[in-house]
Amino acid sequence: MIEELTARIATVEGVDAKLKAFFDWHEAWFTSEVFTGCLFERAIGEYGLSEPELSEVAVRHKKALLALIEGVLQDEFDAGETKRLAGVILMLIDGATAHARAFRDPRTARHAWRATQALLVEARQRSAH
C-alpha cells in the first residue's frame, strides 16, 4: 500500500497535486471489490496494544503513512506546520476509510480531500503573516 501510494504521488508535482493523488488513490481503493476497511486499524481496535507483535505492525504502518504525508508537506511548510497538518490529514483519511467501510460510500475520500484543501489554505494564510 505505501509503495503504491508513493508511486502514485511521484507522478505529479506540487503539494496540492500530490495530496490530491493520495486521496484519489484512497477513493479508488474504497470503490474496489477488495475494500474491507483498514486491516491495521481493525488490528489495533481488536487487540489494542496488548498484542505487541500485531500492534507494532499496525503502528509502523500508520507512522509510514504519516511520514509519506510529511514528506509531501515539507516541500512547502516548516517542520512544526508539517507535523500538525500531517497528523490532521492522517486523521481525515482514517475517518474517511472507516466511514467508507461502514456506509459503503467511496466519496468520503473526496470529502476528506476538500477538508484538507481548507486546512492548506488556512496554513498558507498563517505562514504569509
Predicted regions: what they are:
Residues 29-32, 90-107, 119-126:
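Amphipathic C-terminal alpha-helical segment
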Residues 2, 17-20, 50-75, 87, ...:
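Amphipathic alpha-helical packing segments from all-alpha helical-bundle domains
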Residues 32-53:
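Amphipathic alpha-helical segments used for helix-helix packing
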Residues 5, 9, 48-51, 73, ...:
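Short amphipathic alpha-helical interaction patches enriched in hydrophobic/aromatic residues
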Residues 42, 84-91:
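Residue register of alpha-helical TPR repeats
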Residues 12, 22, 115-129:
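N-terminal hydrophobic signal/anchor transmembrane helix of membrane proteins
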Residues 77-83:
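Short, charged helix-capping/linker segments at alpha-helix termini
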Residues 6-32, 86-89:
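Hydrophobic alpha-helical connector segments
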